[in-house]
Each structure stands twice: as structure tokens, then as C-alpha cells.
Amino acid sequence: MDNKNSDVEDFHREHDWLFSLVTDPEGKRFSVPKTGAQRQRDMHEAMARTADFLAFADNPEAQFPAVHVTGTSGKGSVSMMVGAMLQGMGLRTGLHTSPYLQMPTEKLMVNGCAVSLAGFAKLVRQFRDVHASWGAADGVYNRLRYTEAWTAITFMWLAQQNLDFAVVEAGMGGRLDPTNLMPSELAIITNVAFDHVKSLGPELTDIARHKAGIIKQNKPAITAVTQPELFAILEQEAAEKEAKLYALNRDFSYEVHDAHTITVDAPFGRYERVKVGPVGRYQLGNAAIAIAALDVLVGHQKLAGPINTAALANFSCPGRMEQVSRKPLILLDGAHNPHKMRALVESLKDAFPEKKITAITGSIVNKEVADILQVLVPAVDRIIATAPNVPGKPAVDPAIIQETVAQLSTIPVSTAPDVRTAVDEAMGLAGPDELILVTGSLYLVGEARELWYPVKE
């Protein structure tokens, strides 16, 4: 067997073991219907289990300087932008984002390169050894769950990379997300809107409290939250932790010149006519907070300037307004909550005001599908409903999406059993000057991306 095939087999073996933590030791899924109180209790337990393991593993989360990013929308893009600029400044930069589109190795990046298959397998084996010793130590806990294990693996890996900085995207919420066990030099809170309501809600103020939780004692934070009631929650958290909070429209602002150019008045400097790569207009706000965030790090002497904003000129974000075909024009965008969908629709109107749009959409259960469709449907001319294939996460029946669309509009709507069939159908229906959009779920976009960028290659 050659080394490449051996690496692939090792990768799959170790990833299969990691994924086995999705179930309990009896093989049952942890993800079952729960009340809000049960979900809160589970999140507290996840924090306690992960903290216990990290202490046993010599606290890898404390062994690198970090920027922590949360928010309902834009946190992945902002994380990537901050990472790109840090790398452009010659700094060895680690990046963790979640979820991945096609390969789990995407979640572990250094200077734009994902961990290798062999490196991933080795890392999981290292984790398994520590996990086994921890489990046998007769402590309170003896087994991490999948998300907790991923967090621990991420911290172990980042600690091994001799980084100048790490940028870590929170998974869900913030306060009770296991990534929040990591000390950070800066907290970034992009915005607060409705998402993961059953776990973080029910009110926007509840969600804001979860996001505010990533603010650390005596460490700066920055936010683009502007709603007074929600901003007050962040401000109170910062005051309690004696942390300086920098706010959009108070401490920093930005001006949009065109679809790819902004000027940012940051807390400590002004950044004139910054070019932002071929991305949707909604990414300009993300670029502004990313620039202001690094400006704050420089201002607090945690980073030596100048900031390399030129790194944003060629910035692209897989699965966000990503073009994969020209004739017909096909875009992939993982907008999966109403807030993200509104931003996507505005960008489409701005960039393609005259194009007819066929949207392929699908979602996993527990997403606000009806609310998302209320935003999407008026902006498109045809919908093909399908279902992402995600192990352990049931998808919304495409027939339900079809029925919802029919209640909202008279546009043509059909169903397809999978994304490949949906894309084939869309390409048969759409004219050469029309636009095909795959959206509604990052999982769906990841599957669609496989049609143009096969993992095997």
C-alpha cells in the first residue's frame, strides 16, 4: 500500500472514531428533543466536562494568544479576514472555523493551509491517548462528546503549532460554548439575531447574553451590535469584567465607496479605500469590523502594526457568495438563518439586479425554515427544494419546503431527492443568462461544492 492510500485509511479510521462520540456508549444519539432547561443544563455540563479534560491535558487552550469571534452572522467570515490580515503581516496564524464544508481538516488551518490527512490522524491518536488516560483516572467525567472533543483537539493542535496568533470561531452562542474556555486577547461579537433559538433563546436579549459571555476580564472587545437593548447587555458584561468595549458608530465606523471598497475609521487609526475581494456587499461590514479589531490589538499593544489590509483584496470565502460556474452563473451561499438570508438577498439585488434566479434550497431540522423562506422566496423566480445529507442530523422534508413556498408565492417550485439531482434539474431549466443559487444550509452548500471541487482530487 502506498503512503497516500495509507494516509487516507488512517484519516478515515481516526475520523470514524471521533464521529463515534456523537452517540453515547450504548449507541444512542445525544441529539434528542429537549426542553430549553435541558439544553441549558447540557451546555453547562459540556463546559464542565471539557474544562476537566483540558486541565488533565495541561491546558493547551492557554498556550497561544488568541482572538475569539462570535455572532449570529459573519463570525466565520470575520475570523477568516482577521486570519488573512494577520498572516499578511508575516505572523504564523492558526484558524479554527466551524462547521466545515467538505473536509474536517478545514477546521484546522495554519497560514491558509489545512492540516494534512496524516497530521489529522496523528492528532486524533494523540487525543485518544490522553482521553483514555483521563477516562481511566477515576474522576467525575470519563468521556467527552463530539463537539467537546473537537474543541479539545483544536486546542491541542493550536498549542503545537508555535503560533503568533490563533483566531477561533465559537461554535454556538459564546458563554457556554466550549471554545470559551480559551483565554483571548480580544473578543469580537459581530451581531445578534435569531438563530439556535431553542438553545440560546427564546428572546434576542437571551442570545445577546450568550454572545457577551466571550468578553474576558481586562481584555478589549469589539462589536457591530447597535440595537440599544442588546448593546446594553454587552456593555454591562464589559463593565463587570473591566473590559474596554469598542462599538460600531461610537468608537469606529466605515464608509462604503462601491461594492469592493471601504474606508474604516477605527479606534486608533484610519484605513483609506481598502479593497475587499470578490465577495458579496454584505462582507464589507465584516471587513470593517475585522480591520477595526486588528486596530484595537495594535492600540492595546498586543500586535505590532501596520495592519496589512491589502490581504483583503483577494479575499474569498468558500460557501459565501462563491461562484463555481459562469455559464450558467452558479453561486453557493450557506445562509442558514433569516439574518444571513436578508444579507444575501440584498447582495444579490445589488450585484445581479436583472437576473432571473433559480434557488436550490434545503435545511436540517431545527432551523427557522419558514422564516428563511419568507426572505428568500420574494427574491427568486423558481425554487427546487432538496435535503442535505448529514449523518445524525435529520433534514427537513423537501415536500414541506415545497408546501411552504406555495403558501408564500406562485413561483414554480419542485423537489429533488439530493443536491446533485437538484443542480442537474436547475441547469436544465435555467437559461444561459440566468443565475442558479444553492443556499439555506452550509451542509447543502458543502455537498454542492463537491460537484465542482471533489474531495478525492
Where would I find each of the regions flagged by the language model?
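ATP-dependent carboxylate-amine ligase catalytic core
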Residues: 7, 28-47, 52-55, 59-63, ...
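Hydrophobic anchor at the beta1->P-loop junction of P-loop NTPases
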Residues: 67-71
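Hydrophobic positions on the alpha1 helix immediately C-terminal to the Walker A/P-loop
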Residues: 77-81
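Active-site-proximal loop/hinge segments that shape catalytic or ion-binding/gating pockets
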Residues: 441
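Acidic, Mg2+-coordinating active-site environments of NTP-dependent enzymes
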Residues: 134-138, 161-169, 184-273, 287-306
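C-terminal helical cap/extension that packs against the catalytic core
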Residues: 227-242, 329-330, 338, 373-435
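Nucleotide phosphate-binding/pyrophosphate-handling subdomain across enzymes
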Residues: 165-170, 177-180, 184-188, 192-196, ...
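Beta-strand->loop->alpha-helix junctions that form or flank phosphate-binding loops
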Residues: 96-99, 224-225, 237-256, 276-281, ...
